Amino acid sequence: MIALSSKPECGLGSPTPSPSHGFAENVGNLKDAFGYPDDLDWKLKKGKKLASVEAEDPIAAATMFAGIASEGFVSEMPRDNGYIRKMDDGTIVVLRVTTSSDGSPAVDLNIVGESHIRKIHFYKGDNNA
């Protein structure tokens, strides 16, 4: 689990799409803010890559992560529990404010060219240690 040291700004990313582009163009900003993907402790489970991020405000952190990951999205489908955004390269970014597994917020990344969906859960303190 990686700890997010500062409290992120809360926001759902850009309200309207910025110039469209693929997910790869957002990885540098995700690395700066969250250490993605190298600093996260990835575990393989049921065909998915799972990681956890510790944050002072897990919902704000998940929202920030999803906003950065989906910057430049080409379409969005709102959900009761977040949103699904599609990138120009076909990558899908899903924000779930509350998951059915344990109630934590999570971001799912279905990255074009990868064989596993990446799921990042966000926790407060040592709740998942």
Segment roles from a protein language model:
Residues 1-68, 76, 111-129:
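Low-complexity, glycine/serine/proline-rich disordered segments
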Residues 71-122:
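Functional cores of ribonucleases/endoribonucleases
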